[in-house]
Amino acid sequence: MSTINASSGIIEFTRIFLAVFYTCVAAFYTVKIIVAQIKQPVDLVLPGERFCSTWWNHMTFRFFRLSIWMVCLFRVFFEEIDNYLIMFTSLQTLPIIFTGISLMIFGFMMTIIVHLSMGDKWRSGIDSEGPKQLITNGFFKYSRNPIFLCVAISQIGFFLALPSVFTLVCLTIGLLMLYRQILSEEKHLTKLFVNEYKIYTASVRRWL
């Protein structure tokens, strides 16, 4: 496989792509939350009580999401930032980077689709007063956590698109926070729905 050094064009493309991609991600969630709260004035982002486990999950995820966005934006204007990311040059090949970009696009597009399919039932975090009913149809017939699955796919893609110590740390922490959040949500749903959730978990996998 030819290395990226043989084609500086893909480096510049990836640099711009990542900045645009994470700007779109930030814009999507910002617009979605604003529009949703206009339609129904309720809290949609529920990190939990301050310093509890789910609160730490949310804060850690927000920190890394903001860090990723800022790094990708600044890389467009300051190429020397790459020197501090500790790049894995052996992974900087066209097939790997294009695979990463493809996974990022696929993961994000599927995240949007799942979000839209949930309508006003979507929440970020655990609603102490809900949900009123267990969602088992649509994408939830195939995965108990379709949005988290799509986010994980996109995170893996980010590492492949920009293979470095920085993206590896982001991937590792990101997957850990997703897993911790899943465990907390499963515990909450088990208390709410008991037998119904037990039957659901027996027939549908946590991931896929």
Please state what every model-predicted region is:
Residues M1-E129, Q133, Q155-H188, L192, ...:
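Membrane-anchoring alpha-helices and their flanking helix-loop junctions
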Residues G125-F148:
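Active-site-proximal inter-transmembrane loops
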Residues P146-I156:
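Kinked, hydrophobic transmembrane alpha-helices enriched for aromatic residues
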Residues I147, N195-E196:
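Cytosolic histidine kinase catalytic core of two-component systems
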